[in-house]
Amino acid sequence: MTMKETIDLLGKILTNILIALYEPFGFSLLLSFLAMFFYLYAYEPTAAGKGWKSAIVTWYQKFKESVFFRKLFFLAFVTSLIMFRTLLNRQLWMNPLSDVMGGWGIWETVNGERQLTTECIENVIMMVPFSAVVMWTFGEKIGNGWKKILWQSGKAAFIFSIGIEMLQLLLRLGTFQLSDIFYNTVGGVLGGLMYCAVMKARKRL
């Protein structure tokens, strides 16, 4: 790969990441805010049925006082960003099983021409923050062993990816691709590795 092709690849990846963050930001923030109301309804039922003002005050107090609540809110936000990217911002496909294997490299052939694609790299990058935030949120339950963290982060990304692909298949939003599941899982393991590195660095400080 030449220097120009490398720069084009990095530029395309950066552009797609910024678009993926910018487009659904407000929607994801609102969805996460509403999702945490369901959490409060399930785990703080004493505050239910007292009007919307009381509900908002309870939400704010819980967000201010509970570290776990803030972690869950951030996890809901990251999850909704991914859901928007993979499901809500997609066109309908007549045949979701038209490309089951998917793309496994950064080059693809379209109408006999070789074209650069960043899909596999973006699938890896997409799951890194997700699995890292999952480990951060449930780290106390999972434990500190790096092997266990990598296993759990990879498993979380794999299950989440399978869920997304099945929804794409059932709703005809995009195509079901095995390569997506593989690269998402790799991204999940990398997210777990990043979490391990950050926790290790924090202990040294």
Where are these regions (language model features)?
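Bulky hydrophobic segments
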Residues: 2-173, 178, 192-205
